[in-house]
Amino acid sequence: MENKKTIYFLCTGNSCRSQMAEAWGKKYLGNAWNVFSAGIEAHGVNPNAVRAMKEVGIDISDQTSDVIDSDILNKADLIVTLCSHADSVCPTTPTHVNRVHWGFDDPAGKEWPEFQRVRDEIGARIKKFAETGE
């Protein structure tokens, strides 16, 4: 994983929020961070998440829906949980790994504007982190 830090975005199904976060992370943090995402379960990438990101010029059609990889988890410099479910049932993390929770609504099963809103909120939060480190 070179000399880059590693950030790991986690949510319940690695279908919507963490997929969008991975894409935004690669856009805003890719020069300094290895960016990964995963879920407690792997539900497949939601087609509306793909569509929402495509609308802002980011192609996530090749991203895969993955369950949490303990190797990445243990080597991560920062773990970001994106929903309360992942925050509460996330595997125990090593003490050297910084873990934060950035909660976002789950757009799965909702109307299209909800995907756009959540996409934009996640993008803004990751951009802020890229700019401020917080």
Swiss-Prot record:
Transmembrane residue ranges: none
Protein keywords: Arsenical resistance, Cytoplasm, Disulfide bond, Oxidoreductase, Redox-active center
Disulfide bonds: C11-C83, C83-C90
GO MF term set: arsenate reductase (thioredoxin) activity; protein tyrosine phosphatase activity
Main location: cytoplasm
Superkingdom of source: Bacteria
The protein's enzyme class: oxidoreductase
Keyword Oxidoreductase: yes
Location in the cell: Cytoplasm
SUPFAM superfamilies: Phosphotyrosine protein phosphatases I
Entry EC number(s): 1.20.4.4
InterPro entries: Arsenate_reductase_ArsC, Ptyr_pPase, Ptyr_pPase_sf
Active site: residue positions: C11 (nucleophile), C83 (nucleophile), C90 (nucleophile)
CDD domains in alphabetical order: LMWP_ArsC
Protein role: Catalyzes the reduction of arsenate [As(V)] to arsenite [As(III)].
Similarity remark: Belongs to the low molecular weight phosphotyrosine protein phosphatase family. Thioredoxin-coupled ArsC subfamily.
HAMAP family, alphabetized: Arsenate_reduct (MF_01624)
Protein name per UniProt: Arsenate reductase
Gene name of this polypeptide: arsC
